[in-house]
Amino acid sequence: MRSHYCGDVNKSHVGQEVTLVGWVNRSRDLGGVVFLDLRDREGIVQVVYDPDLPEVFDVASTLRSEFCVQIKGLVRARPDSQINADMRTGEVEILGLELTILNSSAPLPINMDKNQHNTEEQRLKYRYLDLRRPEMADRIVFRSKVTSAVRRFLDGNGFLDIETPILTKATPEGARDYLVPSRTYKGQFFALPQSPQLFKQLLMMSGFDRYYQIVKCFRDEDLRADRQPEFTQIDIETSFMSSDQVMAKTEEMVRGLFQELLNVDLGEFPKMTFEEAMRRFGSDKPDLRNPLELIDVADIVKEVEFAVFNGPANDPEGRVAVLSIPGGAKLSRKQLDEYAKYVTIYGAKGLAWMKVNDLDKGMEGIQSPVLKFLSEDVVKALLERTGAQTGDLILFGADKANIVAESMGALRLKAGEDFDLLQGEWKPLWVVDFPMFERTSDGGLHAMHHPFTAPSNMTPEELEANPIAAISDAYDMVLNGCELGGGSVRIHDSKMQSAVFRILGINDEEATEKFGFLLEALRYGTPPHAGLAFGLDRIIMLMTGASSIRDVMAFPKTTTAACPLTNAPGFANPVQLAELGVSVVEAETKDSETKDAE
């Protein structure tokens, strides 16, 4: 039905007759000539209908937005004065010779113009229309190019594309599972996989030493801009490769993606330990475009007569750190109060500040509500430590170390945006040497990555003797403050795996019930293996500049995990529920809960 895509027509086709199909993006009658912008997934081209061809001109005059049409016409160069540099096809237009309306369109329920606003609900309800918009179509096409490039790279490096089960067993991976009731085994449930983690490890045990899969994963968790209940991973696992080798190979893949699709050279990725990232940036996924760093000053303020500072400064688990913001002294008291309110979101109790109004005036040039507690020597030491200059602002975080890191790390990002401090377009890095475990609120331990991550250079006995000191052989790839992917060397020894389960409070009986198949498989010559999983949606979001992964997925869910297009989730047929042995219990209303409480 067509000879070319609309967006592919260019000056090399001048003088040729072409056949195109697509949708009417816009139609207008200017001085008795109909100008039609025809759109398909590859772009838009202008078609001109002249009254000298009255039959086809009359049909063209009836066209409205989103009519689906076929046109035949002659490609001609536009006059220099009419060239549109903003369009890929802007040097040419098509003189329409024939026109067939393939289908008309009802009045549109959403605005198709990129400058017109539609609500998220409208866009998702009429997603098939939303996806016609060039901005959205470009992202979906780009996504396809990324997955194609990933497959070419991995296929070319000896990786095998192997599918793993979607109906599987629930395992503790940090989020709630989506459960699927079994009709055959009444009262029992499958779980949709949060990742193919255990199956890809089993593939390594099976001898398939280089595996990959572009795979759907499912997590029933609270959503935000970069989370969806179902999402796509680029899943990779290898045998007989060290963590450095896995990082090198996957870095090569990502650098190749950016070079091929964006013409961007990311350069070699620096490595940073988890401890350094938290100390300098308050985050294990630092945005290195932001030049601000957390500066420790506990040694300077530990003797001051101000409990807010000297308390954390003398607490082994406390921290006092500052941010020095160039030009920040111009902030009003109201704006500073907004910053103070902002850090409370992350557990901080408040925010002390110091303005350097005039460095040459000594203490008289300093303004701060806590200045009365600080000696001249302390102020001088703070200025030297931070390198603050006239017009700068120093912000203080003083609390438990984890609260200071989280609150000041978040404030660092906000200040970087507010003061337009970001430098460079792309700043990748590897974060390595993560703690293997971290404390839970009840004093227990949980795995920072997952329970199958191997420690660095420890025996099972050493690990159980001092688990909180263990460093995992894990690594995260970070770009512009977003975690692109994470991975680790896996445990390939059954004694080590059992030790980790015990540390996590999983006794031998529970371990056998949940992971017996894995523990059994580890007994039969399991090779050393390591891997990594990338969030495909997040990679596409970053590469296209989208604000949410919903804008790079064809049919995403809302932030409440619903689909306005299909009205999913929905109620099940009672007959189906009976076959499954499932009954629905209606949730109690707030009124009944109140009465019960009384």
Curated annotation (Swiss-Prot):
Residue span of region Aspartate: 197-200
Coarse class of the protein's main subcellular location: cytoplasm
PROSITE patterns per UniProt: AA_TRNA_LIGASE_II
Catalysed reaction, written as an equation: tRNA(Asp) + L-aspartate + ATP = L-aspartyl-tRNA(Asp) + AMP + diphosphate
Compartments it resides in: Cytoplasm
Domain of life, source organism: Bacteria
Positions contributing to L-aspartate binding: 173, 219, 449, 490
Keyword Protein biosynthesis tagged: yes
Purpose: Catalyzes the attachment of L-aspartate to tRNA(Asp) in a two-step reaction: L-aspartate is first activated by ATP to form Asp-AMP and then transferred to the acceptor end of tRNA(Asp).
Family to which this protein belongs: Belongs to the class-II aminoacyl-tRNA synthetase family. Type 1 subfamily.
Oligomeric and partner information: Homodimer.
Name the UniProt record assigns to this protein: Aspartate--tRNA ligase
Organism name: Shewanella halifaxensis (strain HAW-EB4)
